[in-house]
Amino acid sequence: MDSGDEALRRREQVLRTFFDDEGRLTTIPAKHAKRLVVLDRLAQRFEPGERYPETEVNRLLRSAHDDVAALRRHLVDEGFLGREAGVYWRTGGTVDDPV
């Protein structure tokens, strides 16, 4: 198995561990590498080029986990979302991976 296959296998394992069958996040990972995998998946809920008011960001994130403030902060701090004056937009993450 090459390193790309191994990385994909580890990523899928993290997603299975932290998301339930309905696509809800069971817990926010404490380990940074695992949290990045989870945040990448959450960032896919946002369309590149679209601007989102905070209320819409909260709605989209609440469908995944109740701690929307923590998720917003992590997404911004890790470069998956940008934020200015209460408006958010996608700045990173995987684009072609199905949600």
Q: Which residue stretches match the model-derived regions?
A:
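A short, conserved structural fragment
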Residues: D77-Y88
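Short, cationic-aromatic polyanion-contact patches
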Residues: V87-V99
